Amino acid sequence: MEQYFDAYRIDHVLGFFRIWEVPSQHIYGLLGQFRPALPYTEAEIHDFGFGGDVQALCVPRVTAGTMQKLMADTENAKLAADYFTKDGEWYVLKEAYRSQRAICRLLPEGKTRHTLLQVVCEVLFIRDATHAHLFHPRVGAQRTWLFGALSEADCQAFNHLHDHFFYERNNQFWADEAMKKVPAVTQSADAQHPVLQLYPLNGNGMLPCAEDLGMVPASVKSVLERLEILSLEIQRMPKAYGVRFGNPLDNPYLSVATIATHDMPPLRLWWQQNGEQSQAFWHEALHHNGEAPAEATPEVCEEVVKLHLQSPSMLCLLGWQDWLAISPTLRSKHPETEQINVPANPDQYWQYRMHLTLEELIQATGFNDKVRALIAASGRLDN
């Protein structure tokens, strides 16, 4: 492959650290768990100061108060009698309805089905798929009615054990897992290549670039640096916790800077779809005052392109849609058609095509000269 390519992308590199596994009997990702992982024992959970019944909190249940609210809807009038058993202060979901796929099979589309699908998620812990005596905190369980029924002390304890599990406990374990697998990928392309003049990667002829977006474990950065794999840096998907927009000028050298991936709306479409976000971007990322323009004008798009070109990232790879966006005459009149892939829509296919012909592009000397000038001004053009 190194005869044809100077670089390759490792898609969803986080899967080499761990994957999110959703049981076959369920539909919602909230009921999944990381594999591999280091789940808790009951004793470890109680060591955090959590006093609840861990095994009981693996079974979907709601309080009498929650049940009363659910049954206020006339379509749910028989909810308690038909689908729950009373256990002290709790209404516990009957075993036949603890599978989301079973619910979809047994109940027609409607309010009751929707309610039961939601109630199945009313757990604080999920048993490990392999070792039933071990437990994973349900991700985001703080948004359940069940969490709201805990004492203040148990809420604090659960928050601690939840965050420790997802952000600390597994970090080194996941790093070790990745080191068993990722080197096999990078070393498989081992060959001498002129790209090594720019990128001395222990003889590897192709430059590995990771797609490391999403819920990124803290250990990913150190593993990628150790293996000299470029990270992917996107301004509106910063990796720093609590930061709304990153600053491309802060990107690490071993990275690829881009405005959007093929799974994201290009800048113009994102601006159009996210009025509140684009307003914040106008102030926080571009440092302008006043009201943001209703659409991403050519001037705005050029400003964002320049910012990425000027980043310290080794590579700046921008989508063609974002390049064309800097031209008032060549940009598409229909930005809603420019997103290549919409992951949430299974019926949307990779149908994007450039709206210009190659002949038209060749003749657009003003645009071509401008692109070259922008790249040259950033120091990325080897004259």
Where would I find each of the regions flagged by the language model?
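Catalytic cores of glycan-processing enzymes that make or break glycosidic bonds
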Residues: 1-383
